[in-house]
């Protein structure tokens, strides 16, 4: 919104700052963090009073988790307030990629909120129907992907099929055009990202830091992909307009920092599905917009590992009646093996940093 003040730069030279994505990204980070810091305590106290018993604790989980009983959930509301508030102030709201990303952020956040609401009121882990939840997620993601695809196609950059093509790391010119099926592919990426972060969110601070790492990585990618000079130099696909997504991701990082202040062990609040679905969906949408869907599987490799551990556990148990892991997702397996919660969290953070660096290195390897 504030970018519109650039029109007054003829009279107030300092307003030229608002032209620069880097400045507005930093401002969005600071603003979103400030929003969470200021309103966080009020939101936490309100949720604690309204929820009473807080988020239900799994009976089959590690014994150390029972001391967390009574901790309120839906902390994602704080994160959403920071992201949306800062984005409205600092991002270009006429940018289709920004609007599509915020649509997914709010849409997935609303789904997560309803799921959290059902879990808290029923004091059960059985929230929103799985099929219904996935169906609504796919609709929201599909709408966002469709409009982003149309925008990319209309730009005429890299040919008329660019918007509906899948790009591959290491090869700038190797792309596979799948036509309208790109909406399905992109929807799968976004929904998968949202639910992968959701599965990872099981320990204090475990999900939010890797999310910020991924957001920072994709902030760099979005900025480079949206700049024709850098894109040509690195031989990555130039996608006009995606640089503006760096501002939204700056807001994600700021909101994440603010939330971590309250989520640091012992957590005063959990983000719940409200936050995890929204954050994962946001990262997934940026990956689709910048044509780095496959790279996201590397940068967000920790989330992929967590998801695969659940798929393997469930699939193997259905086939053999036995379990591969002591408990899934895999972070609980290591807890059962004797790792302390802080050991699991910090070691997983280290893995997330390594994977992010590996993912970013693909930008130069062509």
Curated annotation (Swiss-Prot):
Reactions listed under catalytic activity: UDP-N-acetyl-alpha-D-muramoyl-L-alanyl-gamma-D-glutamyl-meso-2,6-diaminopimeloyl-D-alanyl-D-alanine + di-trans,octa-cis-undecaprenyl phosphate = di-trans,octa-cis-undecaprenyl diphospho-N-acetyl-alpha-D-muramoyl-L-alanyl-D-glutamyl-meso-2,6-diaminopimeloyl-D-alanyl-D-alanine + UMP
Protein's cellular compartments: Cell inner membrane
EC number(s) per entry: 2.7.8.13
Record GO biological process: cell division; cell wall organization; peptidoglycan biosynthetic process; regulation of cell shape
Region forming the signal peptide: none
One of the record's GO molecular function terms: metal ion binding
A family per Pfam: Glycos_transf_4
Gene Ontology CC entries for this record: plasma membrane
InterPro entries for the chain: Glycosyl_transferase_4, PNAcMuramoyl-5peptid_Trfase, PNAcMuramoyl-5peptid_Trfase_CS
PROSITE patterns per UniProt: MRAY_1 (PS01347), MRAY_2 (PS01348)
Residue ranges crossing the lipid bilayer per the database entry: 27-47, 71-91, 93-113, 138-158, 174-194, 205-225, 245-265, 268-288, 294-314, 343-363
Cofactor: Mg(2+)
Membrane topology term: Multi-pass membrane protein
Superkingdom assignment: Bacteria
Pathway of action: Cell wall biogenesis; peptidoglycan biosynthesis
Keyword terms: Cell cycle, Cell division, Cell inner membrane, Cell membrane, Cell shape, Cell wall biogenesis/degradation, Magnesium, Membrane, Metal-binding, Peptidoglycan synthesis, Transferase, Transmembrane, Transmembrane helix
Functional description taken from the UniProt entry: Catalyzes the initial step of the lipid cycle reactions in the biosynthesis of the cell wall peptidoglycan: transfers peptidoglycan precursor phospho-MurNAc-pentapeptide from UDP-MurNAc-pentapeptide onto the lipid carrier undecaprenyl phosphate, yielding undecaprenyl-pyrophosphoryl-MurNAc-pentapeptide, known as lipid I.
Family: Belongs to the glycosyltransferase 4 family. MraY subfamily.
NCBIfam families in UniProt: mraY
The protein, known as: Phospho-N-acetylmuramoyl-pentapeptide-transferase
Naturally occurring in which organism (per UniProt): Rhizobium johnstonii (strain DSM 114642 / LMG 32736 / 3841) (Rhizobium leguminosarum bv. viciae)
